[in-house]
C-alpha cells in the first residue's frame, strides 16, 4: 500500500499523552492511529512500535519518545508518547516535545494517581496550555455513580492546578476495546469523540511569525561607515527596515532603529522567524551591544534576575553531576546565547537535590536577562551541561 501523503494545508498542532503509569497512554496512542487509519488519516502504529521508542538526546539528556502523526478532518497532528515517567519529566522540562495541548489519560478503575498529579503540575509549570481528558478502562467500572465520582475528582484536581476543570472535555472509553476494533460507544466511538474534543477544545497555536519580534544576539561587529550589525536567528515575529527595536538584557534597555536587514550578504526589507540575519542598528556603538542580549519589539519583553523554575538535573550516566547539590548552589544558567551565574534556592523541606531529580527552584541571577514565562535554559558548570529548566514564573 502506498503511503498516504499528508496534506500540509491543514493547521498543524503538537499534542501528547500524559498520565500515570499503566493507565493506558500508549494503548490510547495506538488506538488513535488504528481508528484514524480506518479513515485513511493515519498509519497504524502497534503498541510495541510505540512502547519501544528509541532514545534521543536533547541537550545531552537521554529521552525515550515515540512520535506518531495523524490527521483529522480539521488538522494535522504530531503526537508524542513516552514509555517512562522520567521521560515525560525530561520531555516537558526541556521542551524537546513542545505541546500545544495534552491528552490526560486516567484509568477509571483507579482514578487520579501520584503521576497524574505530577503531570498536571508539570503541564502547568512548563506552559502546556490545554488539557483534554480520556477516562480509560471505563468498561471495568459497572457503577455509573463511581464513574461520575472519578470524573469529579479529575475536574477538582485540574482546577487545583489552575486549569479550567469545569470546562475541560472528559471522554469515557476503553482504548483497548478501540484498539481491538470494537465498534461501540466505549470502543472506536470514544476515539472519534476524543479527537472531536481535541479538534474543538485545543485552539490552533499562534505561529512564531505572528508573535512580537525577538532575536537573540549571537555576534556583533562594526562595518566602517555604516555602523554596528547584530547577527542572530529570529526567534519569533518579523522585523522590517525602519522599525524601532529595544536591546534588552545584561545592560540597561536601549532603543534603536533597524536601518538594514541582511541575509546571505543580500539586503532585505524584513527578517522573519527562522531567518538568520544581520541587523544594522542606528547610533549603537560596537561596545554597547553584546551576545546574550536580545533585539525585541519595544515593550514586548523585559529583563529580570529572579524567577521560579522547574528543573531536571542530569544523572551520572547522562554526563551530569555525581553528587547532590544544596541550597545556595551557584552554577551558570545558559539562556539563548549566553551563560549567567545564578544562586539556587531550594523549596522548604528539600535539603538537597540528587542527580536524576526534578525540582522546583527559585533562582537569583547576578545579571538581568530578557525573559518571559516558558523560556528554556540549561544549567552548566564550566561549560558542561548538568541540568535543564524552564521559567515557570517571574518574581522580579
UniProtKB/Swiss-Prot annotation:
It is found in: Cytoplasm. Residues 60-64 are annotated as: G2. The keyword Nucleotide-binding applies. Residues 10-206 form the tr-type G domain. Keywords: Cytoplasm, Elongation factor, GTP-binding, Hydrolase, Magnesium, Metal-binding, Nucleotide-binding, Protein biosynthesis. InterPro entries: EF-Tu_GTP-bd, EF-Tu_GTPase, EFTu-like_2, EFTU_2, G_TR_CS, P-loop_NTPase, Small_GTP-bd, T_Tr_GTP-bd_dom. Its main location: cytoplasm. GO terms for molecular function: GTP binding; GTPase activity; translation elongation factor activity. The keyword Nucleotide-binding applies. GTP binds at residues 19-26, 81-85, 136-139. Mg(2+) binds at residue 26. It catalyses: GTP + H2O = GDP + phosphate + H(+). Its EC number is 3.6.5.3. Residues 19-26 are annotated as: G1. Residues 81-84 are annotated as: G3. It comes from the Bacteria. NCBIfam families: EF-Tu (TIGR00485), PRK00049.1 (NF000766), PRK12735.1 (NF009372), PRK12736.1 (NF009373), small_GTP (TIGR00231). Belongs to the TRAFAC class translation factor GTPase superfamily. Classic translation factor GTPase family. EF-Tu/EF-1A subfamily. Monomer. GTP hydrolase that promotes the GTP-dependent binding of aminoacyl-tRNA to the A-site of ribosomes during protein biosynthesis. This is Elongation factor Tu. It comes from Pelobacter propionicus (strain DSM 2379 / NBRC 103807 / OttBd1).
